[in-house]
Swiss-Prot record:
Top-level taxon of origin: Eukaryota
Protein name from the UniProt record: Dolichyl pyrophosphate Glc1Man9GlcNAc2 alpha-1,3-glucosyltransferase
Ranges facing Lumenal side: 1-34, 149-161, 200-212, 284-300, 397-412, 480-497, 558-570
Keywords: Endoplasmic reticulum, Glycosyltransferase, Membrane, Transferase, Transmembrane, Transmembrane helix
Gene: ALG8
Organism: Eremothecium gossypii (strain ATCC 10895 / CBS 109.51 / FGSC 9923 / NRRL Y-1056)
Amino acid sequence: MAKRSEKTEGANKSGRRRGPGSDAEGAEDSGTRRYSLWNFWVASTALKLLLMPGYYSTDFEVHRNWLAVTHRLPLREWYVDATSQWTLDYPPLFAWFEWALSQVVPGAVRRDGCLELVAEGRYGWPTVVFQRLTVIASEVLLYVVLQVYVNRSAAQERTVNFVVATSVALSPAFLLVDHIHFQYNGFLFAVLVASIVAARERRYVLCGALFTVALCLKHIFLYLAPAYFVFLLRAYVLDLGEFRFRSYRDLVFAVRWGNLCRLGGVVLAIMAVTFAPFAGVMPQLMARLFPFSRGLTHAYWAPNFWAIYSFVDKVLTFLMLRVPYVYKLATSLVQPPLIPASIDEIRARMAAGNHGTRGLVQDVSFVILPQIQPKLTFLLTLFYQVLAVLPVLFDPSFKRFIGSLSLCGFSAFLFGWHVHEKAIMLVIVPFSFLVSFDQRLLTPFRLLTASGYVSLFPLLYSSSSFVIKVLYTLIWCIVYHSALKRTVPASASVQRRVFFFDRLAAVYVMLLLPMVLGVKYLELLEGKFEALEKYQFLGLMCYSIYCAIGVCTSWMGLSWLYNFDEPLWV
């Protein structure tokens, strides 16, 4: 009994000695579990598995063909082969990703025709399952990166950052575009998010390396390059703390040459390893990556400035042809050749050109408004991106960098040439990490996410996809708009704001659902009344214009805060 008592007492003493450490470890473990994305991944994966048998777009055949191209052909023919119309038009690193996937194709999937290099693939359920699973598996990287983002947040920021991380992981864009329409954006944006996390931790070389990898995977990230370039230049390469310009020699000493060599060496090495094997076919590769022969707008107008421009052209054309004296009024204000010289010329232009309502991808011509050239879209994009990156030169903070990154994405989406509606993720993903800083950013963020996600609905035009896309997006907006309102910190200046814009934005967001239901009802009527068949473009136009209003307003709101609300960025 004595020995037993001694053992018990010793155990109690040792337990008391371990107590504080055990409590701390238990609290840390409990906190880790509280902010874990594991349950979200399990639940979302279950939903994605259920969606496997559903609709998929021609992008499924695109990626199947790329598997075949990279598996069957030598390197020098990857960007030359035109057996299928779905030619390889992503950067080489993504081509290597497709090659890696082709190496693990099971025998049953091979026999199903997954790796056949043909003009039009013929495959069945095994190929569908395999390719769907590759999207789900590759998206794991996004969850891992977001978990790192949450775990390495400061304790007081962990809750709001957890909300941001789950909002990105469960984004309707990734569900609709990747797991129904079929693409690999979750994997691609995971690399971009990793570079953002590295920037927050001031690991500048890693940030530059990861962004270079992302760029070599998906060339649309080139639109974000100005923000990365200026941020890394100012934060890592230049030492302007006590800089005083007296002579040009001072500029030499303002450069941290060792840092420049490290960062530049890593970036150039990644680019060299990626593109060097394709040096012999570089012209063909560049032509695939940047096809300026395509038109200003896609077959479905992306909700940007050019959608509104195209809509105004349609309205002016209608008014000048149908309403008396409108043309005379227009010519009294604007003289030819800025507008057509006569009504007959308007009719001739309508008969001759593609005006963006025929679902064609080639160049679009306008009837009333001036024609738009690629050079103009480039200059507009560059102008607004320069405005976005200039503040980073004076304040290379992480907050300024994310604001600049979001506005660079906005500029490219709103004013770029042949922008796809899916490119809205180029804006939403960076903005998601920005909104966590201040409640003043919530209104433009709500406008962007609501209108941006709804603008993706026409991608899934099958009736079976209607309920899932509307219901999932509606639930996401309700949950995350309210969660961010509760968790994002508010500053003192919020109390001095005029809330009319916020209320107007709330009305706009609420009217998105009636717009979607109204367009669906119009589509149902088209099948019953032949007279409505010639107005099939009206539904897509409603999506484009209404969503473009939200995206453009969000851009203007963020631009105002970025350039004129100085306390927000301190």
